[in-house]
Structure formats: structure tokens, C-alpha cells
């Protein structure tokens, strides 16, 4: 019965509001928590953490234990797909991901070995789901193919994305095709191992406009959504095409996602008027980190705007590492009681 499902699953599947607005935060498990810093202090690199079953379970559950969030999101990274496809992914403290740049789709390995490589993550999903109470959702995720492609072609993050934008379009389509196929396999496995909801993080979607947005963001996302829903009809899938602006409307209408997470640059009144779909968002993480009083006022404004609509409270991007835990606690308390 749907009434027994977690609030976030119900909101998305029924397209109806919940009596209480549920809350979880992107990057809720991470460097803002002292228990996270203690748990990872003896690890040598970030990818080691991502492939450690016990650490992933512990880190995923930390914000549930501390803040009683309505959802846990599996502790992982969007570049797991790149790593499994044979890209040499390393994380450098203070810099971010460093990857040997891919110059051809032929450099990407076949995705047949996927389950073996990702088994620690999938096993962690199963363990978290068994330890999570029934009323809480477990969110699995992957990066949007365009975003993953832009990282592996650039060799990491970029301010200009000049390499990927100059990349041969036929070759780029082949890279995105391989990433899309691998993402489908990975997300279906996450669902089979216990994820209740999937989120697609297309963090670099805002770089593209018009026909390029259609080709590299909408098309692969639609393929992923169709493949998942072909196997799991009505499965809740949240899309997050960050910084897509008014293309959020095209995105949700054409991809078939079940809900959309909006970034903090999207005016909430515009979202309410134009995005007729369950919404998630969109408090600015900088406000939460550096101005608690202003963050609380803005959170009230967001809740008031979406009152009576299918809505999940979140940030417009991930929690910043130096966000005080008391600010997060105050936000959760506000959303619970407002």
C-alpha cells in the first residue's frame, strides 16, 4: 500500500503534498559533520572511502542519527561511473577530482564488469536499507551522462569547459552513449539492492543551451528514465539539471523524470508557476553556512511558496564543508515545525 511508503516516495509517486514537508540535504553526509571527519581520518583517498562497505554504511547513516533526516542518500560520488569505465579518478584535497583526460570513446572500458566493481557500493545500499527505518527513504544516485562526460574529457572540474565544448560531436555522443549504458546498469542494480528513490545529478547541465541541451542532457536522461521505468514502472526518479534556468521546463516535460530538484538560482515563484511536477529544493547552501538567521527566513519563504503542493525541502546544491552543524539542526527543526 502506498500509504505505508516513506513520505518522499509518496509525494513523488502520488504527486500530492505530505502533511509535513519532508527534508533531506544534498551532501548531508560529509565534511560538515565532525563524526564524518573522525571516521575518515585514517583513509588515504576519497575513492577508498567510496568502495569501503562499512564506511559507506556508517557515513550514509550519520546525518540520519544526528538530524533525523527523512531520507538517507548513499555516500558515494558521481564519478564512480567514470572509475568503473576505466578512467583514472583521483581526488586531491582542496582541488577536487583529477582524471587522466579521455580523448576517445575507445578509451572507455566495456561496462560488463560493472557489478563486480560496484559490489561494495551495492552491498552498502542493501545494508543501509536494512538498518533504515521504514518511514525513511534511501536515495541512490548517479551523475548525468553529460556531466560525467565533461569531467572525464576535461580531466576534472573546469570554469570554461573548453575541451568538452571543442570535442568532436560524434565522438562526444559515443562517450555519452557509453556512460548512459553504464548508468542504466548501475541504477537498476541500485534499485535491486534496495534504493527507494534515484536522483540524477547533472551538475554541469547549465553550460548548455538549445539543441546542445536537448542532445546531451535531455536525450540521455530520457533513455535512463525509460530503461528504469521499463523495468520498475512508476519508480521515483528525481532529476537535477543544475543551472538549467528556464530549460528546467523542457527537461521535466521531455525526460519523463518523476520530480525535479531546483537549484538556488531558480526563482521559486517561477518554479511554482511553470514546473507542474513534484519539486525539491532550493535553499542557497551559502546562506545556510554563513547566515543562519537569513537562511531560516528564506526557508520559511520557500515553504510558504510551495505549501499545499508536492514538495521536498532541500538545498539548491550540496552542503558546504564549513557549514556549522547547529545551522543544519536549526533548519531541520524549522522545516519540521513551521
From Swiss-Prot:
The lineage is: Bacteria, Pseudomonadati, Pseudomonadota, Alphaproteobacteria, Rickettsiales
Describe which pathway this protein belongs to, using the record's wording: Porphyrin-containing compound metabolism; protoporphyrin-IX biosynthesis; coproporphyrinogen-III from 5-aminolevulinate: step 4/4
Complexes and interactors: Homodimer.
Q: Which NCBIfam families match?
A: hemE
Q: What is this protein called?
A: Uroporphyrinogen decarboxylase
So what EC number does this one have?
4.1.1.37
Is-annotated flag, keyword Lyase? yes
Chief localisation class? cytoplasm
Sites marked Transition state stabilizer: 77
> Catalyses which reaction?
uroporphyrinogen III + 4 H(+) = coproporphyrinogen III + 4 CO2
- State any single GO MF term: uroporphyrinogen decarboxylase activity
* Superkingdom to which the source organism belongs: Bacteria
Q: What does this protein do?
A: Catalyzes the decarboxylation of four acetate groups of uroporphyrinogen-III to yield coproporphyrinogen-III.
What are the UniProt keywords, alphabetically? Answer: Cytoplasm, Decarboxylase, Lyase, Porphyrin biosynthesis
Q: Where does substrate bind?
A: 27-31, 77, 151, 203, 317
What does the sequence similarity comment in the record state about its family? Belongs to the uroporphyrinogen decarboxylase family.
